[in-house]
Swiss-Prot record:
Sample GO molecular function, one term: cyclic pyranopterin monophosphate synthase activity
Family: Belongs to the MoaC family.
Pfam families: MoaC
Top-rank taxon: Bacteria
Catalytic activity, reaction form: (8S)-3',8-cyclo-7,8-dihydroguanosine 5'-triphosphate = cyclic pyranopterin phosphate + diphosphate
Role, per record: Catalyzes the conversion of (8S)-3',8-cyclo-7,8-dihydroguanosine 5'-triphosphate to cyclic pyranopterin monophosphate (cPMP).
Keywords in alphabetical order: Lyase, Molybdenum cofactor biosynthesis
Residues at which substrate binds: L75, C76, H77, M113, E114
Protein name as catalogued: Cyclic pyranopterin monophosphate synthase
Enzyme Commission number(s): 4.6.1.17
Annotated active site: D128
GO annotation terms (biological process): Mo-molybdopterin cofactor biosynthetic process
Length: 162
């Protein structure tokens, strides 16, 4: 079983030392959903929401959040991301918005937290912009879809990993 890398031998939280690691291309994808009433989703789709373009705002928020993950998650390293992508898709058949984020860099540590943060903050931004018309929206699930690069190997949802 894998060890918790952010806990030292004394059981204390610490930042992992990545100075000895090789730089490799690392990438991660994550997703989040925001469930809402059909009327709320229709306002987003047709652009009639009084706060403006919900998807554009959520996309920018997700990108900004990925770049600032190290300020939000205590033991994350500040990273020089080379790519952050946030895509939003209305799914009227399910009364929800699907958000998928992608983060990439060449570096010594992974970008899973950055991808998860991007998707999460984009979802929170949708909630913030739409809460005046609906307060009972549901955010989730939020999950890592895939990661590649690094010592721990690749991961993809649905593949068995021990």
């Amino acid at each position: 079983m894998s060890q918790l890398t952010h806990i030292n031998a004394a059981g204390e939280a610490h930042m992992v030392d990545v100075s000895g690691k090789a730089e490799t291309v690392r990438e991660a994808r994550a997703e989040a959903y925001v469930e809402m009433q059909a009327t709320t989703l229709a306002m987003i789709i047709d652009g009639s929401h009084h706060k403006g373009d919900v998807f554009a705002t959520a996309r920018i928020a997700g990108i900004q959040a990925a770049k600032r993950t190290w300020e939000l998650i205590p033991l994350c390293h500040p990273l020089m991301l080379s790519k952050v992508e946030v895509n939003l898709q209305a799914q009227p058949e399910h009364n929800r918005v699907r958000i998928e984020s992608l983060c990439r860099l060449t570096g010594k540590t992974g970008v899973e937290m950055e991808a998860l943060t991007a998707a999460s903050v984009a979802a929170l931004t949708i909630y913030d912009m739409c809460k005046a018309v609906q307060k009972d929206m549901v955010i989730g699930p939020v999950r890592l879809l895939a990661k590649s690069g690094g010592k721990s190997g690749d991961f993809k949802v649905g593949e068995c990993h021990d």
